[in-house]
Amino acid sequence: MTKGILGKKLGMTQVFAVDGKCIPVTVVEAGPCVVLQKKTEEKDGYNALQLGFGAKKTQSVNKPAMGHFKKSGKGAFEFLREVECENIDDHAVGDEITCDGFFATGDVIDVTGTSKGKGFQGVIKRWNFAGGRASHGSMFHRRPGGIGASAWPSRVFKGKKMAGQMGNKRVTTQGLEVVDVRPEKSLVLIKGAVPGPVNGLLLIRKSRKV
């Protein structure tokens, strides 16, 4: 079985447990993914599957990529990712991997996605700096303050928290719980929030820390 599956974030809602508690959940369309290529330890040095997810118009695909897609016989795909696979011989090119059987209610998973881009932000929003006083004659409000010393070390240390691009980075949220699986619609309900915007690509894997 593969150690991961591709999905798409559809949004957030809430469900009610048997005891009446309200649980915030993220609805994720997990699969179906198609096996496009097999990577074996003998040929490539590791075992993995290349998965395709999300249909794409063939008119917008170049010939080399289309030749790669035709091997599966399932059309073109918008997203291609490699995932680890333990039993590589159990899968063939063209096989579909669905959320049915991959997830079960109560599973603990890790979700990887690209966080929402916030653009260029200052140190208060980006790094939670306290800032200065808002009144009483203060002229220091949202500035970063000192970033180094004068005589020594006479430089700014690497990694100093400063203003800059915020978000739009690969983020993994660990230890999330699967609340419900609805295989007829390829939907998985995950407790809490996951990285990225609506319709963002997600890689869902069984938790490494369980």
Swiss-Prot record:
| A molecular function GO annotation | structural constituent of ribosome
**Name of the gene encoding the protein in the UniProt record:** rplC
| Function, as annotated | One of the primary rRNA binding proteins, it binds directly near the 3'-end of the 23S rRNA, where it nucleates assembly of the 50S subunit.
Q: Which Pfam families match?
A: Ribosomal_L3
Q: Does the keyword Phosphoprotein apply?
A: no
- Kindly state a single biological-process term from the GO annotations of this entry: translation
Q: Which UniProt keywords apply?
A: Ribonucleoprotein, Ribosomal protein, RNA-binding, rRNA-binding
Domain of life the protein comes from = Bacteria
Question: InterPro entries recorded for this chain?
Answer: Ribosomal_uL3 (IPR000597), Ribosomal_uL3_bac/org-type (IPR019927), Ribosomal_uL3_CS (IPR019926), Transl_B-barrel_sf (IPR009000)
Query: How does this protein assemble?
Result: Part of the 50S ribosomal subunit. Forms a cluster with proteins L14 and L19.
Q: Which organism is it from?
A: Syntrophotalea carbinolica (strain DSM 2380 / NBRC 103641 / GraBd1)
Q: Name one GO cellular component term.
A: cytosolic large ribosomal subunit
Q: What is this protein called?
A: Large ribosomal subunit protein uL3
What is stated as this protein's family in its record?
Belongs to the universal ribosomal protein uL3 family.
Upper lineage:
Bacteria, Pseudomonadati, Thermodesulfobacteriota, Desulfuromonadia, Desulfuromonadales
